[in-house]
Amino acid sequence: MAKNNLTRVTEFILMGFMDHPKLEIPLFLVFLSFYLVTLLGNVGMIMLIQVDVKLYTPMYFFLSHLSLLDACYTSVITPQILATLATGKTVISYGHCAAQFFLFTICAGTECFLLAVMAYDRYAAIRNPLLYTVAMNPRLCWSLVVGAYVCGVSGAILRTTCTFTLSFCKDNQINFFFCDLPPLLKLACSDTANIEIVIIFFGNFVILANASVILISYLLIIKTILKVKSSGGRAKTFSTCASHITAVALFFGALIFMYLQSGSGKSLEEDKVVSVFYTVVIPMLNPLIYSLRNKDVKDAFRKVARRLQVSLSM
């Protein structure tokens, strides 16, 4: 019996939707709709930025990478959810689970760093608009983006290595809809204390460090805006940050609830809802957030729409 208990698992069973079998078809349609809208919105945003010369600025350069991350983010998770809901197959191999966790962690970590970079970019634009493109030159922009990806990949390697060096024995049922850190730690049969300290400390550091950069950037932005004499000028200047503030509030709010809040006051169902929100809903909302109140993006979209209309009418 002891020997059986120590057998290493080769696959996991995702139990996230097992409690609601009657909702499988409606959930499939909802997740499929969200996924298609997310891909259309984010890929469309990337293409729009590439084809319109007016959007060749640091702000939209960073936004194109945010859209790329969001498209990848949801593509790591949602196809697995759709396959589970469509086929009823809840089994995921050990290697697939590790790969999903690794890719998901890369996207989440990189997005944290990128949102901090975008906050600094907004400060640079507001502090000295005339020298904005000089200060945020292409070399610096690429360095910041590459730095965000390197930090995201490095963090993912650390978290994945720590998590999957744990022993997973007889119990292989993950009460979640994808391979995320909290349910995997609960499932491990080896001592997780030391590894949890490393993972949680690093994760908290990444979230809090980037949140601090964003907070400092916006404090400096507010300080700069207060120097503007007209109230209309202050409102117009601050409105350029509204989309980014909304995206930051949604993303970091979900991460803080999920990973920084004490687990004693949370239920697993709450974790599932929040996970759906930041892995599926937020990537779908970001293109809308950045385009609805953005005149440049709306003008570029109208221009492309007119070109398509002309080409189709010929």
From Swiss-Prot:
Q: How does it sit in the membrane?
A: Multi-pass membrane protein
Residues with glycosylation annotation: 5
Q: What is its main location?
A: membrane
Q: Name one GO biological process term.
A: G protein-coupled receptor signaling pathway
Keyword set for this entry? Cell membrane, Disulfide bond, G-protein coupled receptor, Glycoprotein, Membrane, Olfaction, Receptor, Sensory transduction, Transducer, Transmembrane, Transmembrane helix
Q: TM spans, by residue?
A: 26-46, 55-75, 100-120, 140-160, 198-217, 238-258, 272-292
So which stretches are on the Extracellular side? 1-25, 76-99, 161-197, 259-271
Q: Which PROSITE patterns does the entry link to?
A: G_PROTEIN_RECEP_F1_1, G_PROTEIN_RECEP_F1_2
Q: A GO molecular-function term, please?
A: G protein-coupled receptor activity
Q: Does the keyword Transmembrane helix apply?
A: yes
Residue pairs linked by disulfide bridges in the UniProt entry: 97-189
Q: Which domain of life is it from?
A: Eukaryota
Gene Ontology cellular-component annotations: plasma membrane
The subcellular localization recorded is: Cell membrane
Cytoplasmic face residues: 47-54, 121-139, 218-237, 293-314
**Protein task:** Odorant receptor.
PANTHER family recorded for this chain?
OLFACTORY RECEPTOR (PTHR48018)
What protein family is recorded? Belongs to the G-protein coupled receptor 1 family.
Know the name of this protein?
A: Olfactory receptor 9I1
